[in-house]
Amino acid sequence: MSLDFGSVALPVQNEDEEYDEEDYEREKELQQLLTDLPHDMLDDDLSSPELQYSDCSEDGTDGQPHHPEQLEMSWNEQMLPKSQSVNGYNEIQSLYAGEKCGNVWEENRSKTEDRHPVYHPEEGGDEGGSGYSPPSKCEQTDLYHLPENFRPYTNGQKQEFNNQATNVIKFSDPQWNHFQGPSCQGLEPYNKVTYKPYQSSAQNNGSPAQEITGSDTFEGLQQQFLGANENSAENMQIIQLQVLNKAKERQLENLIEKLNESERQIRYLNHQLVIIKDEKDGLTLSLRESQKLFQNGKEREIQLEAQIKALETQIQALKVNEEQMIKKSRTTEMALESLKQQLVDLHHSESLQRAREQHESIVMGLTKKYEEQVLSLQKNLDATVTALKEQEDICSRLKDHVKQLERNQEAIKLEKTEIINKLTRSLEESQKQCAHLLQSGSVQEVAQLQFQLQQAQKAHAMSANMNKALQEELTELKDEISLYESAAKLGIHPSDSEGELNIELTESYVDLGIKKVNWKKSKVTSIVQEEDPNEELSKDEFILKLKAEVQRLLGSNSMKRHLVSQLQNDLKDCHKKIEDLHQVKKDEKSIEVETKTDTSEKPKNQLWPESSTSDVVRDDILLLKNEIQVLQQQNQELKETEGKLRNTNQDLCNQMRQMVQDFDHDKQEAVDRCERTYQQHHEAMKTQIRESLLAKHALEKQQLFEAYERTHLQLRSELDKLNKEVTAVQECYLEVCREKDNLELTLRKTTEKEQQTQEKIKEKLIQQLEKEWQSKLDQTIKAMKKKTLDCGSQTDQVTTSDVISKKEMAIMIEEQKCTIQQNLEQEKDIAIKGAMKKLEIELELKHCENITKQVEIAVQNAHQRWLGELPELAEYQALVKAEQKKWEEQHEVSVNKRISFAVSEAKEKWKSELENMRKNILPGKELEEKIHSLQKELELKNEEVPVVIRAELAKARSEWNKEKQEEIHRIQEQNEQDYRQFLDDHRNKINEVLAAAKEDFMKQKTELLLQKETELQTCLDQSRREWTMQEAKRIQLEIYQYEEDILTVLGVLLSDTQKEHISDSEDKQLLEIMSTCSSKWMSVQYFEKLKGCIQKAFQDTLPLLVENADPEWKKRNMAELSKDSASQGTGQGDPGPAAGHHAQPLALQATEAEADKKKVLEIKDLCCGHCFQELEKAKQECQDLKGKLEKCCRHLQHLERKHKAVVEKIGEENNKVVEELIEENNDMKNKLEELQTLCKTPPRSLSAGAIENACLPCSGGALEELRGQYIKAVKKIKCDMLRYIQESKERAAEMVKAEVLRERQETARKMRKYYLICLQQILQDDGKEGAEKKIMNAASKLATMAKLLETPISSKSQSKTTQSALPLTSEMLIAVKKSKRNDVNQKIPCCIESKSNSVNTITRTLCEQAPKRRAACNLQRLLENSEHQSIKHVGSKETHLEFQFGDGSCKHLNSLPRNVSPEFVPCEGEGGFGLHKKKDLLSDNGSESLPHSAAYPFLGTLGNKPSPRCTPGPSESGCMHITFRDSNERLGLKVYKCNPLMESENAASEKSQGLDVQEPPVKDGGDLSDCLGWPSSSATLSFDSREASFVHGRPQGTLEIPSESVKSKQFSPSGYLSDTEESNMICQTMKCQRYQTPYLSEETTYLEPGKISVNCGHPSRHKADRLKSDFKKLSSTLPSSVCQQPSRKLIVPLSSQQDSGFDSPFVNLD
């Protein structure tokens, strides 16, 4: 490490200050020490690159994370420090300054500073004689960045620079503060080095603002400084410091590395801790769930146990009841038999017959008597009824008479009221006449007063109008005054001659409340200039005029004010007059009243002059008074008559009341008698009916009871059966619970074992780390000791502090580790305790809930039992009967009481009424007579009443009987309803219990089914994983082999191209390659083609170089080249060498080749180097992926073993349980059969005990039977479920097959139409040209196509017929093609696979070809560059591409991209795409251009840019295989599908069948001749012919467009494009495909998504996202007819790849 103090000179110090002798001596000693040092050491120090670096300051490094790569880069770059802001010293600088400067400098600083401009290590120091003066304060440098976790090493010294506050070091980093403990302070005196610098004249001259920029100047200055001041004390000091710094540097670096390592380890441990915590959380969750399940199970157990106990008690009770009932039934049977015998005996006896006859005769006599009595009673009743009617008639007559009397009285009252009303009216009239007479006397005076009033009112109106006018004038005047005041403010006032007017004006202002204004003193505030602003005289005139007008206005104003004051005075006068008139009016009214009174009292009045009128009035008044007196007398008489009438009326009313009361009393007595008789009869009938009803009821009760008992017994038997079922279910549930518990235990054990192993591993790791740290620390301590001893020998100071500090460091590190471990343990403990507490609390709560539930259930059960047992108890029945009797007795007593109470009340009423009657008897004789007559009638009626009452009683009895019967019926119905309700409730309860039991059973069933399904699923998943792992391994191996083979081939070819190749060496190379290549796909043809391609690439670079060197020559030859190209375009079918690069003539190449050989070689080296680098990278990636895959495989295998073991255990346990249950069931069945044989013939004389003993084992046997049935049912369900799963899978497979077939048929129809149209178009085009051969070929193909397309799914027999039906022309075609395969090796494998193989081969070939594409990429780039140069000259319009079937000539397609050579036209193979070699050259520029260019928008944008690098993207065709030939042959790209091993194919087919991936072909084909004319998806073909043509005879002109659109991405510079650009390009290509893909063959429609989606073996990882997006876009743009099938089959690999879990086999394949 070097000291870097910047580039600013030291501050000049004062020379006047004193110099100390001691300092001088110390300085001399240091100089001697430094001179003694060897020169070699100095040279080494200076020459070492480390010294020329400066550390970055704290400010620079803090908060910047730096990588070690950046550090290394910055250390290797030798740059100058930049002068930056002075913020204090850097970390390391300050450290070494603090270590080496010592405290002597601190003590003697004040002395030395005064005399010498010395270099203080705190302020600055030169760097090993570098020749530039460092700054006084530290400057930041951006040379290099230390890592974030870099910590400087300070030996624990405190640095206190008292004189310079800016030089105090403050370590801001918190991590560094850990290392500075309190022990550091005591180590100050260990390392104090005194240094006395020597004064040099050269240093004083250093300018403070000097800055050096450049490494050359830096070195020059260094050399100068060394040469000038070799012997100076300063130089020696700096060298010494540098030596020490180097040592410290190394120590620091070691420590930093250790720190970094420790931090990494800590991070790793933290990461592990987090993982462990997550695992712990997961386990706690699972524990909780399992506990919950366990508790639920326990609760269920408890509930079921309670139910079992309840049912057992019920069973026992029922057994007891059964025994009792059997005893009772026996006794009843005996009694019945005895009664029957008695009845028979009685029937035979004669005495009984006699008794019966006697009884019958007695009954007849009684009935006759009863009938006679009834008849007599009816007669009496009729007589009483007639008497009553007569009395009612009399009463009605009396009522009518009373009503007439009331009417008469009302008429009299009305007459009286009319008379009174007439009298009142006459009185009022007379009073009015008197008033009129009084008023007529003062009429004249009133008239006069009214006249005066009218005048006064008029005057008032006039004055009001005047007031209004005055007020309006006032408002106007006020406005004018405001105007005048404003004028006065402007300085306008009247002249002195009119002073009087002014005085008046001011007074009037004061009156109106306007303030006085001093007109003379007021200043003019505004000057108006309107007329002529230039003339001064006009202003004065204007002012004078204004003043005159104002004076006139003021005068008029004063006049108006005078008028206003006058009018106000007039108004006041008017008001006074009005008030006077009002007073006069009041006086007159009072006088009138007085006169009226005087006239009434006095005969004459002085006021009124006419006396005759007053006399007349008086006479009238007297007459009226007399009339009033007469009327009053009449009124009194009428009142007296009214009083009399009222009295008579009251008497009549009283009499009537008495009559009514008497009648009511008599009526009541008769009713009472009737009631008594009725009651007696009612009671007698009641007793009779009650007895009969009770007898009936008892019979019905017995019948019902028997029926209920039967139903009860049936229900009990059903309940028993159900209970048995429940018990069986419970036992099964218990077994399941036990299995679950066992599983949980095993899981826990495994988890505990894993935890233990993890803990052990952790402990081992920690121990290892501690040992490593300890060893490293020991080594560092030893090294540091040695270094410090060396340093001490130079400076005579033993720096023991270094060692101490290292020990401290080690201690600190250990302490940190301990603290971290303790913290971790504490956190773990806390977490565990918290979890335990939570669990305990939850368990307690659940336990409490369980207990409460159990208690509630027990209480409910007990209550139900008690309720059930109550009605069966004999005591309960006896109590019920006793209570019934009591109730009946109480009811009878209460009824009797009520009757007696009613009778007594009636008697009392009657007595009271009698007394009232006696009191109110009138003395009238008439009334007495009437009463007597009535009494007589009553007596007569009383005699008749009993007969009537009897008849009524009979009616009442019949009615009462009916009512009672109805009541009885109602009661019976109610009883029946209650019983039905009880039965319904009972049934509902039973149904509920049954439903609950069924639900439990179904739940358990579903749980079991779910468990089995999960187990099956896990097994399936495991098998899938195994298969995927194996596939991945196989694919990886194949990829690796292909990569190695391609690398070897390329290496050999590239090494060969640099030398001049000889024919002999070619054969050797071929042999070497064939021997080295492990894979069988290598062939002579492939090797030749590769070689040809490389040669062509190197040849094509020459014209590029020529063009760059000589542009003028290029311009001259442009015309010639275009002519040549045109001439070549006209000649069809010419297979000359111009096809290689038609833009350059061969002669020119020959001349230029020698000159440009060197350039070519350089380009070769560059290209090859790039290729090799890429291949190496790919290899490394492959190896990494392999390692990861192996790890994943191991992990998977381990998991599989575990799972298998667990599943096997579970299966074994289940089987054991089932077998045990079956054995038990068989045993129980045997026992049951034995018992049944015993119980088949039970004797009649068996006792109750024997029956009981027989019943118990029967119930047990039934239970066991139920249990066996349940186990069988469970087994059956399992089998059914497995069968159902298999059937559903088969159904799904069939559905898939059916859909595939349907879709294929649809696509076949569409393809057929499309091909027919295309062929018709080709025929038409060929007709224009007039080529008869082509027409014949096309016609023959049309016929074959039509035949084949009519039968898309044909059997082998059909294919044979089609084969025979092929026309001669197609056979001729094949023969021609075969004849052209001269030089090609026929041993290339052509894989004709089975149906199931078709999908698998596609995916595999895709994976296999990925490295091939990468290897061939750079060659293709060179080809593109060369072709780009040749295409430049051709216009945008290019001719339509056509394929000639016979001779293979074709035209260029307009939709080709510009940077692709016209020689490589993409054609469609059977399984992928290849590039077709064009035979023809370009035709005229003016030839018609097709509108296909719109289909390639992104290719058009690329233009003339040659692609610098072409890396195959994920959407490129996966089955490309590029082959090259010699330069003589036509260059073409062929498509191969070579699978070397048929065994692997078979294996793959098996696997594909296992995965249900089936793709039946449209047409079966075994032979090439069979497959002609139809696109076969089952057979994949390899092109062997040199001619690039379609083996299947498709019209190529139309099919090239989609193939081009898919393939064109190979020619785009995808390596340098961003993701967004690529996605845009893909979108555009997909737009093109939308219109063209439906017409592609079936093979291509299935392949294109495959090319995009299946990319397992591709090593580049950054392409995965692009792959997904491309696939989505492709699937969205393709039409439904094409997309449906591939999407179904090819989305599966994508989803599997996306799985990034630890267990997944596709961990990092992307």
UniProtKB/Swiss-Prot annotation:
The modification Phosphothreonine is found at T1241. GO terms for biological process: cell projection organization; centriole replication; centrosome duplication; de novo centriole assembly involved in multi-ciliated epithelial cell differentiation. Residues 1-60 are annotated as: Interaction with PLK4. One of its GO terms (molecular function) is protein kinase binding. Keywords: Cilium biogenesis/degradation, Coiled coil, Cytoplasm, Cytoskeleton, Disease variant, Dwarfism, Intellectual disability, Phosphoprotein, Primary microcephaly. Residues 234-490, 615-664, 700-772, 902-993, 1170-1241 form a coiled coil. Residues 108-123, 587-604 have a biased composition (Basic and acidic residues). It is found in: Cytoplasm, Cytoskeleton, Microtubule organizing center, Centrosome; Cytoplasm, Cytoskeleton, Microtubule organizing center, Centrosome, Centriole. One of its GO terms (cellular component) is cytosol. Its main location: cytoplasm. Necessary for centrosome duplication; the function also seems to involve CEP63, CDK5RAP2 and WDR62 through a stepwise assembled complex at the centrosome that recruits CDK2 required for centriole duplication. Acts as a molecular scaffold facilitating the interaction of PLK4 and CPAP, 2 molecules involved in centriole formation. Proposed to snatch PLK4 away from PLK4:CEP92 complexes in early G1 daughter centriole and to reposition PLK4 at the outer boundary of a newly forming CEP152 ring structure. Belongs to the CEP152 family. This is Centrosomal protein of 152 kDa. It comes from Homo sapiens (Human). The gene is CEP152.
